Amino acid sequence: RTFSQKMVPSRRLSKLCLSCHDGTVAVDSFGGRTGTTLLTGGDSVGTALNNDHPIGFTYNTALATADGSLHDPNTKTVTIGSGAQTKTGTIAATMLYSGKLECSSCHDVHNTFTAGSGGLLKVSDTGSAICLACHNK
């Protein structure tokens, strides 16, 4: 299943995100404002996000077929953004980077194609829509 994929931020763009948002600092800091969540404790770099969605893995037809509960990223169409700022295309074209799932697959840090539901999500989290964009449940 998808959650058995290892978290391997293989691209610079996810490494850039994780340089601040590693689960220990800047948990809810974005959009030019300081977050309110403060964490204390020992160093947990590399483990803090292990219970979150994996990143840095190849999401392709072979994975979708083997998993059985994922949409084929080359045929499933999704719409990211909201209002006048939307883009429609396959999962591969709108959410993946060189065929890999990265932080920016779901989060739009430049706020160009956000769904307006918080967390800078490209697809609304209402009714688990962001999850159902890829997961066939």
Describe the residue ranges of each PLM region:
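C-type cytochrome heme-c attachment and multiheme electron-transfer modules
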Residues: 1-137
